Regions:
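Membrane-embedded alpha-helical bundles that constitute the cytochrome b-like, heme-associated redox core
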Residues: 1-240
Length: 240
């Protein structure tokens, strides 16, 4: 017999679907290029905000949104592979996937902040590095995306596998926030599924993520104007 519990809070679910949509849109705008490259940059900043929010929410959000509940420690991975793991949220392999995706996205967004396309686009932090380093980071930005794409495909394959083989729908709970689990499992694990969720914590997370986006998108430069590395190089006296 099963019961329905609330497992994923609304901020977590909104983050998940907004991230999926924005990464998809970012990929499309990058491939099309041209006038859409500016939108690619805006989407990158939006994804940065989502990532910062998720990191903060991973510490102060509700129970199953917190990293401590699903971080793939060695003991958890061993228990899962031996069939002894009991839990409601992300299983250890799922937790490993989440950490890998977040880390890869962080590198992808971080390199994009300094990137350029040698035509008209420059990342918001382009002026803080010299052109050669920006070119190097641009190369990493392009390379890391291939790894990110592989992780996304693996994520989708896992969803299909769970639906087809294990008869477990992972999509519906991420839409509704609710999940059906055996009563015995509900009694064996923590039941405080919404612990920590509250408007003040949500507001704090939004303030932190918004502040970071504001800072890297020009806020820091407005408060503390700096001369770009390119301008410094041009102003340096020539040696004969």
């Amino acid at each position: 017999m099963k019961i329905t519990i609330h497992i994923w809070d609304l901020p977590h679910r909104l983050f998940h679907w907004l991230l999926a949509a924005s990464v998809t849109a970012s990929y499309i705008t990058a491939k099309i290029g041209g006038a859409l490259i500016d939108w690619h940059g805006r989407l990158g900043l939006f994804i940065l905000g989502l990532l910062v929010f998720r990191i903060v929410w991973g510490f102060i959000g509700s129970t199953h949104s917190r990293f401590v509940t699903f971080f793939p420690t060695f003991s958890r991975l061993v228990a899962y592979l031996k069939g002894r793991w009991q839990g409601i949220g992300h299983n250890p392999l799922g937790g490993l996937s989440v950490i890998a995706l977040l880390a890869t996205l962080a590198v992808q967004v971080g390199t994009g902040l300094f990137a350029n396309d040698d035509i008209a686009f420059e990342g918001p932090l382009f002026d803080f590095v010299d052109k050669s380093f920006s070119d190097q980071l641009t190369g990493w930005h392009n390379t890391v995306f291939d790894f990110l794409l592989a992780l996304v495909v693996l994520h989708l394959v896992a969803i299909i596998f769970y639906r087809g083989v294990k008869k477990t729908n992972l999509v519906v709970p991420m839409l509704t926030g609710k999940k059906k689990i055996p009563i015995a499992l509900a009694e064996a694990v923590a039941t405080d599924h919404d612990k920590g969720f509250g408007p003040l914590r949500l507001i704090l997370s939004l303030i932190i993520s918004s502040t970071v986006v504001w800072g890297v998108s020009g806020g820091i430069s407005q408060l503390y104007p700096v001369q770009s590395q390119q301008q410094i190089a041009q102003a340096a006296p020539s040696s004969f």
